[in-house]
């Protein structure tokens, strides 16, 4: 009963105003601006003691507020944006589904096979390293009898040396000096049996000597003197 009475009062107040169906935002903004001016006028009238004008402004303000309230009641509820979203997209409590990952994991055998293929994919020496090794030092070490002798052949910066060890503990050396320090040596079996040396001087002198097993040194030399 009371609600019907309020609706009837609203209709009576809205008799001189535009119907709610033709209301626009500009019209609502005009009412809001007018209400602001009415409030300021009411405060001014109260300060100045103008009671009649204050009551008239209050009645006008109340009328405008009732009209705006009636417009708000006549508008349909705006629930359309909420209904646009499907219900299955709403967040639901509960554990999340996790897909199985067993197919993505690798067993230890496949990991070992992949590691082996990566280790043996490249050769031990590159072609550049093989070429450097071929032009570098060439060594041959065949095993001998007795004390494990070695023989080597090396070519390095113009110097050639060849040495071989016998079955004994020590070996002598034969040196031939031709101005460029290139030596050719041979050692026989036995310990300190003998050594011979032959040297050719650049000036034309030759000398030869022999050392016997007793340690004596015999020197036989011939020198060519200019006439």
Swiss-Prot record:
Annotated knockout phenotype: Dwarf plants with narrow and small leaves, reduced number of branches in the tassel leaves, fasciated ears and sterile florets.
Cross-referenced InterPro entries: SS18_N
Region (Disordered): 186-227
GO-annotated biological processes: adaxial/abaxial pattern specification; cell division; cell population proliferation; cotyledon development; floral meristem determinacy; leaf development; positive regulation of DNA-templated transcription; root meristem growth
Annotated keywords: Activator, Transcription, Transcription regulation
Source domain of life: Eukaryota
Expression by tissue: Expressed in shoots, aerial roots, ears and tassels. Expressed in the shoot apical meristem (SAM), young leaf primordia, leaf margins, inflorescence meristem, floral meristem and spikelet meristem.
One Gene Ontology cellular component: nucleus
Pfam families: SSXT
Keyword Transcription regulation set for record: yes
UniProt function note: Transcription coactivator that plays a role in the regulation of meristematic function in leaves, stems and inflorescences. Regulates shoot architecture and meristem determinacy. Binds to the inflorescence architecture gene UB3 (unbranched3). Regulates the expression of several genes involved in inflorescence architecture. Component of a network formed by the microRNA396 (miRNA396), the GRFs and their interacting factors (GIFs) acting in the regulation of meristem function, at least partially through the control of cell proliferation.
Subunit text: Interacts with several GRFs. Interacts with GRF10. Interacts with GRF1.
Similarity annotation: Belongs to the SS18 family.
Record protein name field: GRF-interacting factor 1
